[in-house]
Amino acid sequence: MKILVTDDSRVMRQIVIRTLRQAGYDDHEIIQAEDGWEALQMVGAEKPDLVLSDWNMPEMTGIECLEALRAAGSQVPFGFVTSEGSPEMREKAANAGALFLIAKPFTEENFRDALDGVLS
């Protein structure tokens, strides 16, 4: 399986990838995007099985990327890994088609709880 990790911070992408590996998802291919626009292009080209995205990024935000994917007919599983964890943000994410929102700071357990049903 292929996971697309999208965040404008290279360090945060590495932290997400390390946490995925610690949570037991070390046999998945992981690809990276620096913003929502790049992620949108990569979903078409790379066909990931899951997109993990930050919310706030330049060029195109995570929520804009998700909305664009859904408008284009893509049903790729999509979840947020972001510092925005308010009930309003969770509701907006769910209404746009996100399967989950993992709030920073996160643990490997947060990843297992969110991803076990998606990557099984």
Residue ranges and their predicted role:
Residues D8, K104:
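A Lys-centered signature of the CheY-like receiver
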Residues R10-I31:
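Two-component/phosphorelay signaling modules centered on CheY-like receiver
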Residues D35-E38, T61-E64:
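Acidic catalytic/metal-coordinating carboxylates
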Residues E46-L52:
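Active-site beta3 strand of CheY-like receiver
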Residues D54, T82:
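Active-site residues of response regulator receiver
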Residues M57:
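Receiver (REC) domain active-site loop signature in two-component systems and cognate sites
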Residues E64, G85-F100:
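Alpha4 helix (beta4-alpha4-beta5 surface) of REC/receiver domains from two-component response regulators
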Residues E88, F106-L115:
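C-terminal output helix
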